[in-house]
Amino acid sequence: MTGWSRRRLLRTALSTALVPATAALSSASPALAATGEWRFRRGVNAWPWFALTREFPAPRTDYDWPPFQSQRPVPTPDDLRRLRRTGLDFVRLPVDPGPFLAADAATRAKLLAMLDDAVAAVIDADLGIIVNVQANGATHYWNPDRMVSSTAAPEFEAYRALVGTLAGRLQRFPSVALEPVNEPPQSCSSNVWSNVQAALLAAARASSQTLPLVVTGGCGSMVSGLAALDPEPLAAFEPILFTFHFYEPYLFSHQGAPWMREPVYRALNNVPWPASAGSLERTLASVRARMAGDTETSEADKQAAYAETERVLKVYFDARPDRWFVDKYIGQARDWADSHGIAPTRVIMGEFGALRTDARYVAAPNPDRARYIADVRQSAEASGFPWAFWDLFDGMGMMDDKTRSLDPAMVDALGLRMPE
C-alpha cells in the first residue's frame, strides 16, 4: 500500500466513498477459463522487509549501504513458521526497486542474493510467496512517476529490465509468483497503463515462460480498476493471476493515518464499524479532542479541516455502511471474473486492512477494526477470492514489531488460529 497512488485517488474518494462504481463487462474468454493449481489462499503482506530505505538527499540518486533501515521489523524464520501454523499459506513481499536500480553491478548482485534468501526462507516455512515490485512514492528520485507513469518515463526501461531479471531468478523457486507493479496510478481504463503492464509482462516472459505473473487494473488496483480491465490481451502472458486491493470506505480504514496528505484523515478517529455501532456526534467529539491537542496546525486550517470532516462524516453515517457495503464492492470483482470466465481462485485481494489505535496511532477503535477485517475477509471468501492482509507489522499489522506476539483479535478476524 503506497500512499502516492492512493492519495491521488482519495481526492475524490472522500465524496464518493459510499457509491460503488459500475462497469460494463464483456463476454467470457475461453482462453482465460483455466483454473490451475495455485498455492495462494490466505496470505499476509511482509512490508517493510525490503522497504524503508536510506536514500541520500538530492541531487544524489543512490542509497547508503545497506539500503534498508536496520531498525525495520523483518520476520525471522521462527516468525514465518508461526505464521504458517496460524493457517496462512503465503506471503506477499513488497520490494522497493530503488536500491536495486541505483546500485552498481556488484551491489545489485548482493541485493538480489538478499532477496533470494528471503524467498527461500518463506518457502522453507512451507509458505508460498508473491514478490511485488512496489515503488515508493516518498522517494525523491526512484519513485513511481519516474518509473511506471508511462513507457516513456525516464527510468521505465531500467524498471522493465529489473522485472525481467527478477522473473529469471524467481523461476527456479516453487510456489512463487511475480507482481510487477503495485497500485498503478493511471485511470481505470487508461491505455497508458495497459501499455506499461504489457511491456512489463513481456519482459518477465522473456526470462521465464512458466513463472506465474500477477496482473491488475488501473485506479490504484481498486475494484473499479479491475472491473475496467480487459483480460483478453493478457492471455498471451499465461500463466497469470489477477489482483485488486480493498480499503473502502477509506474514512474507516485510513482514519488517523499520519501519512495521508488530506487534512481530514489526520485528526479523524473513533469512526465506528459498522456505522450503526456509533454516532456522528461521538465521532465529531473525538475529532475535536484530537484537533485540540494539535499544536502544529493553524486554527484556520483546523477549522477548514473540521468543516470538511463534518461533511464527509455526515455522508458516512447517513449511508450506514455495514457488511452489505463490502459485499457490493467485492461482488463487482466477482461479476467481472464470472463475465470473463475467470475462476475466482485466480483473483487475489492482494491488500486489505485498517489502521489500529495504539501507542503510536489514534485511529479506529480496535473492536471496530476487528469487525471490519472480519467482514472484508468473509466477503472475499464468499466470492471465492484468495486474500493477503495488510500488514504483518506496524499500525496495520497482526504481529508486534518488538515482542513478535500475534494479535489474537486479528488472528480471529482473519479466521486463523493462534499457533501453539
What are these regions (language model features)?
Residues 1-17:
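N-terminal secretory signal peptides and thylakoid transit peptides that target proteins
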Residues 21-36:
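C-terminal segment of N-terminal export signals and the immediately downstream linker at the start
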Residues 37-212, 217-227, 237, 410-413:
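Active-site mouth of glycoside hydrolases
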Residues 94-96, 133-137, 219, 350-354, ...:
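Short, solvent-exposed turn/loop segments enriched in Gly/Ser/Thr/Pro and often Arg
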Residues 141-156, 257-268, 404-405:
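Aromatic- and acidic-residue-enriched segments that line the glycan-binding/catalytic groove
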Residues 157-322, 331-355, 382-383:
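Active-site region of glycoside hydrolase catalytic domains
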Residues 359-420:
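Aromatic-rich peripheral "rim/lid" segments of glycoside hydrolase catalytic domains that contact
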